From Swiss-Prot:
Lineage: Bacteria, Pseudomonadati, Pseudomonadota, Gammaproteobacteria, Enterobacterales
Species of provenance: Escherichia coli O6:H1 (strain CFT073 / ATCC 700928 / UPEC)
Assigned GO CC terms: plasma membrane
Keywords: Amino-acid transport, Cell inner membrane, Cell membrane, Membrane, Transmembrane, Transmembrane helix, Transport
Annotated compartments: Cell inner membrane
Homology family: Belongs to the GntP permease family.
Name of the protein in question: D-serine transporter DsdX
Transmembrane segments: 5-25, 29-49, 57-77, 106-126, 140-160, 178-198, 224-244, 265-285, 302-322, 343-363, 385-405, 425-445
Pfam families: GntP_permease
Length: 445
């Protein structure tokens, strides 16, 4: 049995090792997490074969569920991208005269972000911000910051996004409930961290026109886009199916045939599988795409997920090593003796890791590995709430270590100081508001 000082030192050094190898030595996060796994196993006295077996089971156990959902979700996102469905949502919301332009960008980010990776969402939707900025003579910062903040929020707190799904799965949280709570918290955080924060700044927010190098980026011709009804149906279908499963679990007898059917179609794998074929028809065939074209788009989409799958698999390995080495159990006792509220702890760990590593996904996986062991000591706090707390922390502190920071800086034509001052602050405010929303939810449910 290792001393508590040894356990804490091992964990802290492993986190520093992850940060240094990623930030300083430019290791891929997959390699950094595996290196940290071997380090923890060695320091905790695990045998070589035990380490390998734990890493193997960690990767397999994690990707066994998530690989299919991430793959299917990628197809959905790709169909949204190539069909112009995301632009359709933005153009339709633009017609709502009672909504301000910055609030429209938040709603576009939240809805479209459900099926799009955050960086893809920024690249795909920023032309809409350019278009509105030109028409209304508005500072691009006032539109791009709410959009990117909303995309980041939904990326961190709403399954079936990979990191949010990973956290919910590892904590044993109900995915349908996490979706509902995540959308509520994400909307509140995005509105306050985006439009409200920028409104508070008023004239202090500098005017930023569309950069000349992006002046040619335009929204597609509206006549070529799918209908709003078809778009929303496709985007919301997998979420609706997963919510039906949650409702069935709360209200139906387990032995009924209907309950079994709803459990089946509401499973994230089945729900996204059904949604993919709906997307193929609604956003593909009805838009005059051939099956060959859709196959090409699907293959192109799969090429982009190898990175995220490897990172998530390595995160599962790190988690498995913490459990197998008994570090997790000792850590749970140490954390419980700190008398810090688990919601605050989950948020703080994810926030710090995101700032250090620059990846919300890695931050959420690391926070899950640290916080999960102590959950049995707090039976009154649901795993759904902790999942939202971890995601809320990962929203904040988008700084120079995060590629999204540079993407926003580039598209807005902002200086380094301006990006820190306005975008980093916006994400931090959104993160704090999301934390407050999580605490509020914990008192209600």
């Amino acid at each position: 049995m290792h001393s508590q000082i040894w356990v804490v030192s091992t964990l802290l050094i492993s986190i520093v090792l992850i940060v240094l190898t990623i930030v300083k030595f430019k290791f891929h996060p997959f390699l950094a997490l595996l290196l940290a796994s071997f380090f923890v196993g060695t320091m905790m006295g695990m045998g070589p074969l035990d380490m390998v077996n734990a890493i193997e089971s960690g990767i397999g156990g994690t990707l066994g569920f998530l690989a299919a959902v991430i793959g299917l979700g990628t197809i959905l996102g790709k169909m949204m991208e190539v069909s112009g469905a995301a632009e359709r949502i933005g153009l339709t919301l633009q017609r709502c005269r009672w909504l301000s332009a910055d609030v429209i960008m938040v709603l576009v980010g939240l809805i479209c972000g459900i099926t799009l990776f955050v960086e893809v969402g920024v690249v795909l939707l920023i032309p809409l911000a350019f278009s509105i900025a030109k028409k209304t003579n508005t500072s691009l910062l006032k539109l791009a910051i709410p959009l990117c903040t909303a995309l980041m929020a939904v990326h961190c707190v709403v399954p079936p996004h990979p990191a949010a799904l990973y956290v919910a799965n590892k904590l044993g949280a109900d995915i349908g409930s996490v979706i509902v709570y995540g959308l509520l918290v994400g909307l509140m955080a995005s509105l306050i961290g985006g439009p409200l924060f920028l409104k508070f700044l008023g004239q202090r927010l500098p005017f930023k026109p569309v950069p000349t190098e992006f002046a040619d980026l335009k929204v597609r011709d509206e006549k070529t886009l799918p209908s709003l009804g078809a778009t929303l149906f496709t985007v919301l279908l997998p979420i609706a199916l997963m919510l039906v499963k949650t409702i069935a679990e709360l209200n139906m007898a387990r032995e009924s045939g209907l309950y079994t059917l709803l459990e089946f179609i509401g499973n994230p794998i089945t729900a996204t599988f059904i949604a993919v074929f709906v997307a193929y028809y609604v956003l593909g065939i009805r838009q005059h795409m051939s099956m060959g074209t859709m196959l090409t788009h699907t293959e192109n989409g799969f090429g982009s997920i190898a990175n995220i799958l490897l990172i998530i698999g390595a995160g599962g390995a790190f988690n498995a090593i913490l459990k197998s080495s008994s570090l997790a159990d000792t850590l749970a006792v140490i954390l419980s003796n700190m008398h810090m509220h688990p919601i605050l702890l989950a948020w703080l760990v994810a926030l710090i890791l995101h700032a250090a590593v620059g990846s919300a996904t890695v931050a959420m996986m690391g926070a899950t590995a640290i916080v999960a062991p102590m959950l049995p000591l707090y039976p009154d706090i649901s795993p759904e709430i902790i999942a939202i707390a971890i995601g809320s922390g990962a929203i904040g502190c988008t700084i120079v270590t995060d590629s999204l920071f540079w993407l926003v800086k580039q598209y807005c034509g902002a200086t380094l100081n301006e990006t820190f001052k306005y975008y980093t602050t916006a994400t931090f405010i959104a993160s704090v508001i999301a934390l407050a929303g999580t605490f509020l939810l914990s008192f209600i449910i």
